[in-house]
């Protein structure tokens, strides 16, 4: 009964800490700070001594933080971890495709593999080595670490989307300025030419385009009419124009 009570108290404590950690992750929009908070949470809540954090970039695992000695020497072997979908003890993985990877992890004294999931896809990997008190990780500890890792991954993805939104908004503002400049280069009025009616208007299918026109009086009754149309649309065409 005492053991059950201790386990229950531990679960309640972990749930409360997950709630608090989730709020902290929710206000961070920089990948470096999110990874740092994840590291501190693992060390503070589980007493993790050595760990490594990988994130998926261009279908490869990129090491973002590590306290595991000599890990860098095995980075190529660890790329297959990108296919791991469930957390577990290193010794429990039996997949043939992970054989060399698991052997390398055992040599590095890594005990736990935790995929960092987002929308049912492995977006990162968390490796846990020994703890400060050298106690083994329980199933509850693995579940807790997995929860923290997934919260961190959600925060990282939200931060990425936030950055993309800001960049898109900035680009739209710059394109609008470019449109105003481009429209300003077009003649506001056309000269009256005897025996000719000339009308011109430029309505781009996008914010900027590759069309241009001009009517210039040379001398007396001589005029030059210029009409240009760059192949393509949008920004590439406008840059050429």
Task: Give the role of each language-model region.
Residues 126-148, 233:
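Regulatory loop-to-helix N-cap segments in sensory/regulatory domains
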Residues 31-32, 166-241:
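… and, occasionally, acidic/histidine-rich disordered N-termini of signaling adaptors
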Residues 1, 119-125, 144-167:
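Signal-transmission/dimerization alpha-helices at domain junctions
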